Amino acid sequence: MAHQKILILDFGSQVTQLIARRVREQQVYCEIHPFDVSDDFVREFAPAGVILSGGPNSVYEAVGWHAPQSVFELGVPVLGICYGMQTMAQQLGGSVESSGKREFGYAEIRARGHSELFRSIEDRTNDEGHGLLDVWMSHGDKVTALPPGFKVIASNESCPVAGMADEVRKFYAVQFHPEVTHTIKGRDMLARFVHEICGCGRDWNMPDYVNEAIEKVRAQVGQEEVILGLSGGVDSSVVAALLHRAIGEQLTCVFVDNGLLRLNEAEQVMLTFARNLGVKVIHVDATEQFMGHLKGVSDPEAKRKIIGREFVEVFQAEANKLPNAKWLAQGTIYPDVIESAGSKTGKAHTIKSHHNVGGLPETLNLKLLEPLRELFKDEVRELGIALGLPHEMVYRHPFPGPGLGVRILGEVKQEFAELLRRADAIFIDELRAADWYDKTSQAFAVFLPVKSVGVMGDGRTYEYVVALRAVETQDFMTAHWAELPHSLLGKVSNRIINEVRGINRVVYDISGKPPATIEWE
């Protein structure tokens, strides 16, 4: 199916992905590409509209950091955001200068000039009846002269041109960021742009995308066999369900139990995929192999490397038993692709692999199949539901690739893994029972390799400590510790201490990100 598309050109903003997510939320397909794509690429992409992102540079200093001229010659609407507004102004004959000081944070602007972009969109009105908008600014330059044909559509004292438009050509630009949640009516503005100004319908949704994705896989794979490293995480689980629906017996999954999984995770994966869905799954219990190589190792990075290396070894051994497999499937998702886009945006040039298959040797000689590479995480979850996966599996909290290996501080021992598994399961059970699981973005227990004195009954105990961690976040770039009810924390602590022999103290981590990271290692 040919979707109407929005082209987003990335000038290096930290929040460019948010633009794409907001557009996709409107059920409109879009793609992010580096700003320096060729004119031919822009024409062949055939967008219904173009969005120019923000960026860290100044248009009068960054030589060559401008949009392809074809963007303004296609005859389609264009929206410039922050730096995107400045390059639009400069390229079309206006002027941009330094503001003298950066404007960062909340700002109130007045909508002016009866623009189509802002029509009936306001947070409130002033005494004269003019529409006012609460927006988020992040800029050090400003437009000082409009290009021919443009008018001011938004302003405030510190930013006389907070928005501009050429309504005839449908070129719009704003100095603020409509994609961030701090701009209260930002979603409404982007919806107005893609639906009413660009004329896009709502033809991008996961239930309808299932058949399209299945056809893509069948066309790519044909009659050849595929191997997938199934971890039990959201991405690989959705890939497994999609490929099984598309190619059935041509798919073989390899599930490696490294001894660092959550409680009953191996059983749940086998039940869901092998027994309920009928997927061909090879279950490899490599606990002893992993634990043996982790013995005596305390450094977090060293542990990660060992766990990754041993996974590769186990997976390769199983792959060698499947000589007919021609494809390696991975759970690469769209943010991975964006982050590896490279170009002058200064982003990494190496594709970031799915954590379980990272570093698989090229000697496998397998072609790469990445059926989720166009999807954001929320879309992957929606696709999983559309494919019939259980809600509890699809909406599970993130789990690190090395598993409990980086939630056991210091040396990893099987005994520690068992204690942590049970404590973590109690925490998650109680969060679910209290309807707090879906209110938190990530929650887990951490094993601390220290002992503390306690009293149980009439006896003294000297046992281990577990820390509980729960955070709320929209993007995992920053996070706030979840303010769980004290009664809930008390119940979790009481259960862990009474039910998990070997733990006599439970603490709660109230660190935000920054300065702390979400995971402890």
Swiss-Prot record:
Question: At the top level of its lineage, which domain of life is listed?
Answer: Bacteria
Which residues does the annotation say bind ATP? 231-237
Task: List, alphabetically, the GO terms of the cellular component aspect.
Answer: cytosol
Going by the record, the broad EC class of this enzyme is ligase
Q: Which GO terms describe its molecular function?
A: ATP binding; GMP synthase activity
For this protein, the record's NCBIfam families field holds: guaA_Cterm (TIGR00884), guaA_Nterm (TIGR00888), PRK00074.1 (NF000848)
The identity of this protein, by name, is: GMP synthase [glutamine-hydrolyzing]
Q: Give the gene symbol.
A: guaA
